[in-house]
């Protein structure tokens, strides 16, 4: 679907990487632009090489000297030959390097430039450093998490703000590419992760203003709960009444039907489910619409045999960028030659000065 679309990824760590992975899975040629001698910090973090490989499969890597005239010249030629640029710096960083949207669109008016930021460049927090946990905390979603034994909100096991920002950015990029077909012009996009996660709980804010409590989807309902069984856990998400009635029928307690939202029923359901194994309950619910599934470990998911990793189906196919993740600068020569740089220009743009390698 995106064959022929070239994406330059200047970002680091998770948000930009997952955004451009989604685009790569749809056929885009994603070029990770890294600083010569350094590369993405993820490469050097504990477990980083494994995570880097998962996030950058099928992409290409170019290593350049960002802070030199030769490096800038190479970047301008890359931009002139590309469709999309993704970056994840704090507002103003790319501009200080002479690589902001206003600088680059002079070399490519059709460029779609997407900045994935922590906080809006137009807001009071624009210069504040932050990561996923900070955005979840300030925007409100962290306060909605279940509490730990110490009384603190539980930290989600996945980086929800990072991934939400990535998906939102990919959606915005696709919309801008569609718009470009009609206008022949690109545009600058900004995706502040703080704003993304706050938008997820708009209905909670509406309820708070109206003093209306919404559904407790954090384990306070018997119909939406994680139950312990003999050898693991079983998830029940029977929010709609027909699903809940089916659930009650399978466990042999149709009398619990009227108590779908009665928290006192949780212990009764738990006592029924606990003696049997997870597989026994899976077999009992087979073919019954009750929204009941086992809670699988990562190892069990890998062994399950269900195709993984491609969030979009195209007429039954699972598009997926193929090939291993690139080593630092692995495709520099090839990509820069494709963009028309001479051997001398390539050499000048790629040699890492001692102060840049530190």
Language-model-derived ranges and their functions:
Residues 37, 118-120, 193-198, 231, ...:
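Glycine-rich beta-alpha junction loops
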Residues 257-271, 295-304, 344-358:
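Short linear loop/turn motifs
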Residues 177-214:
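Substrate-binding/catalytic subdomain of NAD(P)-dependent oxidoreductase enzymes
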